[in-house]
Each structure stands twice: as structure tokens, then as C-alpha cells.
Amino acid sequence: MAFTQALVTVLALLAGTLPHRHSENSPPKKANGDKCVHHTQCSSDCCLIDLERSGAFCTPKSRIGMGCLPQTKGSLNIMCPCRSGLNCHSKDPTCPRRCQMI
């Protein structure tokens, strides 16, 4: 009986502390062009550093033929990963990676 009560208490604590993916309290995703500090804030999942505009802004993922990075690491990007259905690839190690259909 004590084990069951302890288990219920632990589950209740975990349920209250774990973030919900689609909670009513979670802020809406930002549109392209909006300022951001982390890629998860953007509806495109890409927060790109823009030195000319002195900040970071949500931007669309890279299209076919555009420069890319294979994945998002950290909170900000210097290049965005590819859109769905494209792969970030380079045929030659000395050439920059580009989004391609493979």
C-alpha cells in the first residue's frame, strides 16, 4: 500500500514538472523574419544569425541548391538545415555542402 502511494506521488510530481509539447501555456511559434534566440522558437525550426541586422531571426530551411548544414546544433544557426525531402551533401570535401535530392 505504501509503495502504491509513493508511486502515485512520484507520478504526480513528474506530471507537474515535465513540459507538455502542445500546452495551452506554450507560446506560439514565431514566423519567418521574427527575432529569435533559439531554433525551437521558430515555426521553420531555424534561427539564423544575421550580422547585418545585428541579431538572429527565424528563416525558412534551405531549398535545393542552397548552402546548408547537416543538422541544427546549439541554439542558433549560421546556415539552416535542408527542407524536408532534401539532404545536405557535398560531392567534393573541398566544396561547401548544398541541399540536394538524393
From Swiss-Prot:
Gene: Clpsl2
rRNA processing recorded as keyword: no
UniProt GO BP: digestion; lipid catabolic process
Single GO MF annotation: enzyme activator activity
PROSITE patterns, alphabetized: COLIPASE_2
Subcellular location: Secreted
Highest taxon above the source species: Eukaryota
Keywords, in A-Z order: Disulfide bond, Secreted, Signal
UniProt source species: Mus musculus (Mouse)
Disulphide bond pairs: 36-47, 42-58, 46-80, 68-88, 82-99
InterPro entries: Colipase
Annotated Gene Ontology cellular component terms: extracellular region
Protein name: Colipase-like protein 2
Sequence similarity: Belongs to the colipase family.
Signal peptide segment: 1-23
Primary localisation category: secreted
Keyword Disulfide bond: yes
Listed Gene3D superfamilies: Lipase, subunit A
